[in-house]
Regions:
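Switch II of P-loop NTPase G domains
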Residues: 1-35, 39-55, 59, 115-127
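ATP/adenylate-binding site constellation spanning eukaryotic-like Ser/Thr protein kinases
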Residues: 3-6, 70, 132, 203
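Residue-level signature of catalytic and energy-coupling elements of molecular machines
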Residues: 5, 23, 34, 73, ...
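Conserved nucleotide-binding/hydrolysis micro-motifs of P-loop NTPases
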Residues: 8-10, 38-44, 51-53, 66-67, ...
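Amphipathic alpha-helical coiled-coil segments
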Residues: 30, 61, 66-69, 73, ...
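Short, compositionally biased low-complexity segments
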Residues: 37-44, 67-79, 154-159
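Buried, small/hydrophobic-residue-enriched core segments of structured protein domains
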Residues: 49-65, 101, 110
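C-terminal-of-GTPase-core extension/linker across diverse P-loop GTPases
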Residues: 79-250
């Protein structure tokens, strides 16, 4: 997982305030959004709004994503109308999905909250909407009272993780949550010289998982020898697991 620091978001970013347009175009290139939100008080560290209010910060960020998406969707709907009027089936289908998403955005909700079936989701995918991306909230909570954290986490609008950037705590949880958010998992290869970790999409078959090592694995895959990890540990070695009949071919 690669984390990209995108700075410059302020209220009005969707209208070009601050680094608005640059910020928003950078977000379009990522697979998910990690919103790092300040929870701790420190008079020596200035807050852009001159007060620490994590829920308000989240609201501001999400609203800017929503407004940017609303403009994108509205423009697309407008551009489709000529094709819709002449009965183009593809345009009609896309227009219907866009109108559903537009309604969600107009109600100040993230596009991801729109109820879409698989076909509709595929249609909207090409729009690369900002608020359709999965979001994880990282609460930077150095030395914050527990009751403050509890209040914030009760109202936070999605998955979150607690971190402490000063003392570098919670980063392992952050990585785990990021993997979950993106639907990723890790498998390991091991040999005499090294053990390596490979990142794949959850549920990948062996041939697809093998492409993380080399693309040839997909096209030239024949079979896999499988053994449960606990059986392998109990046996003490792969050779012994094979001798005990614990290895099967799939």
């Amino acid at each position: 997982v690669e984390f990209v620091d995108i700075a410059g978001l302020i209220e009005g970013a969707s209208k070009g305030e601050g680094l608005g347009n640059k910020f928003l175009s950078n977000i379009r290139e990522v697979d998910a959004i990690l919103e790092v939100v300040r929870v701790f008080e420190d008079k020596d560290i200035i807050h852009v709004a001159n007060k620490v209010d994590p829920l308000q910060d989240i609201s501001v960020i999400n609203l800017e994503l929503i407004l940017a998406d609303l403009e994108t969707v509205s423009k697309r709907i407008s551009n489709l109308q000529k094709d819709v009027k002449r009965g183009d089936k593809v345009a009609i289908a896309e227009n219907a999905v866009l109108e559903k998403v537009e309604k969600t955005l107009s109600d100040s909700h993230l596009a991801s909250e729109t109820v879409l079936d698989e076909k509709e989701s595929e249609i909207i995918k090409s729009m690369h909407l900002l608020s359709m991306k999965p979001i994880l909230y990282a609460l930077n909570s150095s030395e914050v009272a527990e009751n403050v954290i509890e209040k914030v986490t009760k109202e936070i609008p999605g998955s979150y993780v607690l971190i402490d950037a000063i003392f570098e705590k919670g980063f392992e949880d952050l990585i785990k949550k990021s993997y979950e958010l993106l639907g990723l998992e890790t498998y390991f290869t091991t040999g005499e010289d090294e053990t390596r970790a490979w990142t794949i999409k959850k549920g990948s078959t062996a041939p697809i998982a093998g492409t993380a090592i080399h693309t040839d694995f997909k096209d030239k895959f024949i079979r896999a020898e499988v053994v449960f990890w606990k059986d392998l540990l109990d046996a003490g070695s792969y050779a012994e697991a094979r001798n005990k009949g614990l290895v099967r071919t799939e």
